[in-house]
Amino acid sequence: MEANIKPKRIWRKVLLIIAGVMLFLFLAILCLIPPFIMKDMVDLHVNFSETYEASDFDLTANELSLKTKDGIKIAAYEVYTELPKAVVIFISGIHNPSVTSYFGHAKWLKEHGYASILYELRAHGDSEGNTICLGYKEILDTKAVVDYIKSENKYKDVPIVVFGVSMGGATAINSIGEINEIDGLISCSAYASWDDAFSDNMLNMGAPKAIAFTVQPFVKLYTDFKYGFDTANITPEQEIKKLGDRPALLMHSKDDSQVPYPSFTRIMKNAPPQVETWVRDGDIHFIVKENAFFNPEDDKEYADTIIGFLEKHFGT
């Protein structure tokens, strides 16, 4: 009898060991997926194939070099107008375009009485850095611009509005949540969190839901280790809660293929009641129609939405 029991116990132990090894390998694979996929996305300096000069838009810009709290030099371009109603800080996306593409927006806003400062995120263009931080550390870039504005007498008592697109939109929301000196927000196509965006895009590429959702917490774990656990709660869906009574305009397109629409709904679940929204049909990631990117007034619906928001809250 005992002779029969011993082999059973041995096989039970063997099966437990095999199951443990398989579980370990499975978890190891899940841990390796985020860095394997993200490495080529974030461990680089973006050198743009196309950049623009202010003169291309019949503008004059003051070129700035601003240093962040963590020692990164940020390139920025200031388009000033006398007695501005507000100064708008422009922030672009993860890999493109250069923020200099928004000189057309700066020209348009100047015609309406608004100054602009366009800055290249760390690890982009003429800014320093070799790691894209997905909106976690880029709030320090925004803070450097805000500190410059606050140091200039010409901007005394002038409201500050942050305007971001895609990862820049996420950075804009994170920035207004962390920087009290910012008075207003315009965000286009922001993701609710990076791990949400990662999971949503896996689903868009045809990955089974079970895999996409299983990988998501490992993406979060990876970004926490990579960017520091002090950034763990710095996500747009959390930072929007800190808006207080400041005005905000959030925009998204329903069929966005880069930052799927569920990110917008997640952010809005936590948004204060005064937050204004505009949703476009189709896949228009930059919200402005492609043929009007450099001349936003040519997209009347887009232009009216933004100017209407600015005039409503900062026009007097």
Task: Place the predicted regions along the sequence by residue.
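C-terminal catalytic histidine-bearing segment of alpha/beta-hydrolase fold enzymes
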Residues: K269-T316
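The serine-hydrolase catalytic nucleophile loop
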Residues: H95-W108, L121
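Conserved alpha/beta-hydrolase
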Residues: W108-E128
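Hydrolase active-site cap/lid region
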Residues: S175-F229
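An N-terminal hydrophobic leader/cap segment in hydrolases
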Residues: V14-K67, Y77
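Short beta-strand/loop motif that positions the catalytic acidic residue
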Residues: L243-G244, L249-H252, D256
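Short alpha-helix in the alpha/beta-hydrolase fold that links the catalytic acid
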Residues: P260-K269
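Alpha/beta-hydrolase active-site loop
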Residues: I132-N153
